Every structure is written in C-alpha cells, then in structure tokens.
Amino acid sequence: MIDAMYATGQGLMGGIWPATVWPVLWVLIKIVAVLAPLMGCVAYLTLWERKAIGFTQVRVGPNRIGPFGLLQPIADALKLLTKEIIIPTAASKGLFILGPIMTIMPALAAWAVIPFGPDVALANVNAGLLFIMAITSLEVYGVIIAGWGSNSKYAFLGAMRASAQMVSYEIAMGFCLVVVLMVSGSLNMTDIVMSQGSGMAASKGLTFLSWNWLPLLPIFVVYFISSLAETNRHPFDVVEGESEIVAGHMVEYSGMSFAMFFLAEYANMILVSVLCVLLFLGGWLSPIDSALFTWIPGWIWLGLKTFVVVTIFLWVRSTFPRFRYDQIMRLGWKIFIPVTLVWLVVVGAWMQTPYNIWK
C-alpha cells in the first residue's frame, strides 16, 4: 500500500519537480503522518488520565471546557504556549535550552521504525529493535543536561535519580528484548509480530495463545514494570517526587520548555505501550482467527491493545503508593536483572529441546 502511494505520487509529481524532490517530500509526508496523530494522542492521553484517575477517586474529572471536557487539552496547550519561558540567572543558558530538546527528540525518533501493519512503517529496517534500544537510551542525556544546566540542587538531585533509575532498568529491558529476539529470530519489528501468528494454538484459531506473553510471561511482567520505571511513571516517579524535590529536573522550567518534558513523558508512555503490544501481544494480529475478528483492520487492533496497556499504566498510578528510591534500585538490580538472566538461559535451553514451540 505504501509503495503504491509512493509510485502514484511520483507519477503525478514527476513532470512538475525534479526527480530528487519527490523522495524528500515523501519522507516529510510520512513523518507528519506519524507525528501529527501522535501529538493528538499525547494531548488526549492527558485528558484520559485525569478522567480515569477521577473515576477511581469518585470524581468527574475535567468537565468545564467543551462538552465533557473534550477541549481541555487544547486549553492546556494554549496556556503553555502563552506562558513566559523563564531562564534562571545562574543557569547555563545553552544547556538549559538543550535539555528539553534532547529529551523529546529520542521519544519522537523511535517512532520511525514502529510498524502499524505488515507494510505500514516510516522505515522498515532490519535492525528496528536495535535502533529502538539505541535511540531510547539517549533520553537520559536530556534529563542530566536539564538538571545540570538549571544550576539548582533540586533539579540536580532529580536528574541524578532519573539517570540512575533509567540506566538500571534499561539493563533489564534490554535482556527482555534479547529473549524476544531469540524466539523470533529477527530484529525486524514486522518479523517479530508475524512470528507470533504461528504455532499450535494459532493453527486452531486461538491466535492470542501463540503470542509471546504466554510462554514468556515472566519476561512480559518484567518488561511492563521496567517500562513504568523507564518512563518515570508511578510508582517509580521519585524523580519528580512532589513531597521531596518538587518536580525534579523540571523544577526550573516553565511554558513550552516544561511542555516539551511533558510531551516526551507521554510520548514515551505510548511508545513503550506500543512496543509491549508488538513484542508480546501480537501487534496488529487479531486475537482469534475467525471472520468475526479478522475483518477489523490491523491498525485498529494495534490501537485497541495499546489503549488497554496505557490504561493499565493509569490504573497503576491511581492504585499503588510510590516506592522509596532504595527500593527501586533493589528491585532493578537484585530481582529483575537476575530473573531476566535466568530466563535468558531457560529459553535458550528450551529452544534446543524437541519441545521448542518457536520452530
């Protein structure tokens, strides 16, 4: 489908512009087609979060601006756009401005290799999973730069907490992704999804039982909890612990500079949820191989599964208390990393037996 659209556009534009213009324009069109809906989802995820948490606390949530509060994200965006960006006198101006940029860029760049269907991706590269692991690890630099450049004790302490926490849980997440790589035999995101559509259960129509979440259940749980820590979401949000260090590395930011951190956090939350769906929950594959389910387009299945995972993120925030910082470090280093290493060996040994279900 993407190739057909490209060929059609090339035929229409070929006689108007030089041959080198259309490929560049096509890349820009694909980038906008991915990022524009993403920004809309990020905006309305904030509304859904406030509504969902309001429901758990027997409140209505935002309901003043627009019908049922549907225009609240637009009002929030306008408010942040019109606020002044204040740079502290003692701050390092260059680093202070670079921090939010370095934080949001990896959160957006990782979407380049996320497939929305069998042939629908901004860039369908063979090392897609490796690209995501590499690009998302750069976000910690933005947090450190923001904390250092602010020249504030609270910001610096929050940045140190964030960097230690993100690096710690990246190791466990990396081992989880290595296990998925072993069973799928590919770093290509599309191949990883398609490999989950085969097996004994899938041959009987129960595709959801052949997805990676079932045979790799401990890895799935570790990945999900590590995703909470990696995105600094509750109960791992000691980075911006309101009762201790106000807002962590973001304490000196205002206006759109603060909004960029905000956008990065929610874009990352959607990203790790989509990755969870692609790696463990069958991506765009329907849960049951029957006409009742397969007529629904794959991108809708992907969206529905992602919505469920994101909602679980919000449920965790409204349910569990915040961990102490030492508890977070202990969980990452003494529990998750050993568990993932053990399962790495178990899955490797399992694949060498006659009972290998991933052949």
Curated annotation (Swiss-Prot):
It comes from the Bacteria. GO terms for molecular function: NADH dehydrogenase activity; oxidoreductase activity, acting on NAD(P)H, quinone or similar compound as acceptor; quinone binding. It catalyses: a quinone + NADH + 5 H(+)(in) = a quinol + NAD(+) + 4 H(+)(out). Its EC number is 7.1.1.-. GO terms for cellular component: plasma membrane. Keywords: Cell inner membrane, Cell membrane, Membrane, NAD, Quinone, Translocase, Transmembrane, Transmembrane helix, Ubiquinone. Its main location: membrane. The chain crosses the membrane at residues 16-36, 94-114, 128-148, 167-187, 205-225, 261-281, 296-316, 331-351. One of its GO terms (biological process) is aerobic respiration. It is an enzyme of class 7 (translocase). InterPro entries: NADH_UbQ_OxRdtase_su1/FPO, NADH_UbQ_OxRdtase_su1_CS. It is a multi-pass membrane protein. It is found in: Cell inner membrane. NDH-1 is composed of 14 different subunits. Subunits NuoA, H, J, K, L, M, N constitute the membrane sector of the complex. NDH-1 shuttles electrons from NADH, via FMN and iron-sulfur (Fe-S) centers, to quinones in the respiratory chain. The immediate electron acceptor for the enzyme in this species is believed to be ubiquinone. Couples the redox reaction to proton translocation (for every two electrons transferred, four hydrogen ions are translocated across the cytoplasmic membrane), and thus conserves the redox energy in a proton gradient. This subunit may bind ubiquinone. Belongs to the complex I subunit 1 family. This is NADH-quinone oxidoreductase subunit H. It comes from Polaromonas naphthalenivorans (strain CJ2). The gene is nuoH.
